[in-house]
Structures are given as structure tokens and as C-alpha cells.
Amino acid sequence: MPFSADSVTSLRQLADALAARSVSAEELAREYLARIEQAAALNAFIHVDAERTLAQARAADERRARGEAAPLTGVPIAHKDVFVTRGWRATAGSKMLANYESPFDATVVERMAAAGMVTLGKTNMDEFAMGSSNENSHFGPVRNPWDTSRVPGGSSGGSAAAVAAGLAPAATGTDTGGSIRQPSSFSGITGIKPTYGRVSRYGMIAFASSLDQAGPMAHSAEDCALLLNAMAGFDPRDSTSITPAQGGVDEDYTRLLGQPRAGATTERPLAGLRIGLPKEYFGKGLSADVEQAVRAALAEYEKLGATLVEVTLPKTELSIPVYYVIAPAEASSNLSRFDGVRYGHRAAEYRDLLDMYKKSRAEGFGAEVKRRIMVGTYVLSHGYYDAYYLQAQKIRRIIADDFQRAFAQCDVIMGPVAPTVAWKLGEKTSDPVQMYLADIFTLSTSLAGLPGMSVPCGFGEAGMPVGLQLIGNYFDEARLLQTAHAFQQATDWHLRRPGKA
């Protein structure tokens, strides 16, 4: 019987099949490229270069033949189009960069290539990672594989849809205010945002530099741990990368998977784990279907030996205004370089240099990006800096301190990723504030720089996936992944696929 990726449920199985020569990297790449072509209506990919992909796959096969294969050699991966890639376009979902090709690879892309992974293409995303639905892309919206009339989440919606639909076994994403966790939840996959600084930002087109963080998106916690092993580590080219002296040491993120906690048993592997439930995450605004799925997941954790503890994160509501001051302020600075001279689209007709700047930016940026640039410029302007930006930074510190008080009472925090399941395409586009409010449960984690992840935990309205959010303390990714893996060993939500749920 010929090999089919449909029979594979994890990256480890895929790696084992490659190692056993049940399939070659080239055969695997061809299978996924065919799937991408067949599912073009999802609009998950912006750029596919089959010849380049197959050349990488053949190189992986040659590496294996020489006995030089790493654990992930030959395994395909899709990259969010916010990472620059030599030889591929890197658009950030924007007309401004529609034809941009980078002369170098982002560190994340470089490290995945060093691990032998094969790039399938560049995935669609909200323009410059600004959005929660993947409707802000210059290249059109991405459709959710579970219901193509709904959004996949954003801004890493193309990556989430690609993994959920089986167009790629794994993908890279970025998370500034929830852009790995929320689309993972909406699309029924697993994704983790590491501690800020764990993964290099070098070559990642910046949105908000103090918040942006790259991470893996796949089907399971084990997959994410394997990917994080390849992805994470100190990078001297990124000034925000955590140095070894600061705690950014290389580690094996798979080391705790399947291991009971100290003093626990195999039947109750999480005995002694204290799960903090922020009361602010279970109040008004949380839909009943999402709460039901999350509560059922928490009950499963109790069966695994964990205890539930109520904690408080009193400034949760303030995370929205704080984020939407700080992130646009940083975006207005970062995006100033896209002026038609240094980078990006240049208007065809203009009177003088100033007119060229204005027309190039007006034509090159979409509505949401323009909105955030204007907000950011305003809050940084003379007379408003202290009232808005400085005040937001002070509250950001309070939010981080609130998490530390909560972690004094628990080991991991859990709750919903989003207040609802994925909404219909176009449902919120006319009301940006409603779109922003959908990020209520993910923003504070990003503001604090903490690691957080989403794991599938059930289904809600219209059979749409629901994600459980797990939040850890700084550098606690291995424990988060262990905790998520234990849940996935006891349940099968992460094995469900669109059309087969």
C-alpha cells in the first residue's frame, strides 16, 4: 500500500517514515504540493514555488543518504509570509511588499532549513500581522477549513488553515497579541507563543517590536516541542534575543513529554499541578459553548491529577486599551521605512518627493494598517505621549506583576483563548472595536512577555473548534508542553480533522 500522509498523525511519525525509507522527502513534498493546489480556494498560501520546494526535498534525501539526517530532515513546513526568505517573495500580506524578495533568510527560516525541513511555501496573513481574522490581507481572506464561510483567525490564519486542512504538517507563525493562539483555536490545531526573546526576530518583518514573537503551529504539543527545538535559541543578530546569561539557554523542549510530574503516577501524571483559573476569564462576554468546552477540558485535567485554583488578573480589561496604544505606536515607527524609497511600493505618478511619499503609502497600505499608523502617530505626538503611551507602559508593568502574583498560587494558568468560536467572514470588518475585543484573553500574556499556547479541547457553535489556553511563567515552555501533551494523550481533540470530526 503506498504511503499517504493522511495516515500520519504527528511529525514524529512522519520523521520515522522518512527514516525507514517508507517515503522520500521528494515524494512527500509532491503530495503536499498537490494538496495545496487542490485546496487553492482556502487561499492559505500567497506564494508557492514547486521547483524550489522539490530542490530542497531532493537535498534532504541526499543528506539522509549520506547519513547526515537530523530528526526533522525532509519534513515539510510552511512559513508565514512575515519571515523574509531568500529566493521567495516576502510580502507581509501587503501591497506595499507585493513584489519584495529578500537577499537573506530570517533566522527562523534559516534554522528550519538547517534542521533539514522543506519549505512548501509562504502562507497568507493579515497585512503586517495586524488583524484577528485574516481578512486584512492584500491577497484576499483565508477561509477556515472547518467552515469556509468563516474566518480562520489571525494574523497567522494562512498557517493555521494550512495545517488544519492537511496542506502542511506544520507551519511557523508569529504572535503579537494572540496571532498564534487565536487562529490555532479557531482552526482546531495546536500552537505555542514562546517567552518573548526565546525565538529570534531577525528577518521577521516587524509590527510591534516589544511584542512580536515567533512560534510553531502544528497538530500536537509533541509536534510543537520538536519544532521549538529547531527554532529557538540565542541569536546575536537580534537585540531582543534572550542571552544564555538571561536564561536563554538551549534546551530540549521534548524532555518532559510523557513524564509524570515528580511524585505523580502514570495514571495521574499531573498530580500536584496547580491550575490557576482567572475569574476575569470566565465572566461576562464568554459564550456558553466555549465555556462548556473549556470546563470539560479542565475536568479532564482534574482526572489527570491536577487541582484547580481561582486566581485573579484584575487588569485584564485594561489589556485592550494598553495593547492598542503600545502596538500601534511601535507599528507607526516600524512602518515608517516603507516609503517608496527605502522599501516598498512606489506610486507611478507624483509631483515631488513629499507627494511620492504620501501617494506610495496611501496606495501601499490597507485600511487597518493605516488606522493603526494614525493611532500610533497620535499617541506618540507631543502633548499626548505622557497621557497615552507612557501611561500604557506603566499599566503594562502592572499587568506583568499581576501574573507573578497569580503564579505564586499556581503552576500554570488556563482559560479560553477567545470569547467565541470563529465568526463569519465579513461579520466584524465594519466594526474594528468588536474585532479588537475578540483578543481580550490573549493580549495580557503578550504584554507580559509570557509563554502561552492553544490546544484543541472540543467544539462549539456550528461544530467549530474551541481552544484551551495554557499560560506559563517565563521560560516555562517545557512544562506547558508537558501539561498540554498529557491532555492530548488522554483525549483525541487534536486528532480531529475538518470533515472527519
Swiss-Prot record:
Belongs to the amidase family. GatA subfamily. SUPFAM superfamilies: Amidase signature (AS) enzymes. Heterotrimer of A, B and C subunits. It is an enzyme of class 6 (ligase). The active site is at K80, S155, S179. It comes from the Bacteria. Its EC number is 6.3.5.7. One of its GO terms (biological process) is translation. This is Glutamyl-tRNA(Gln) amidotransferase subunit A.
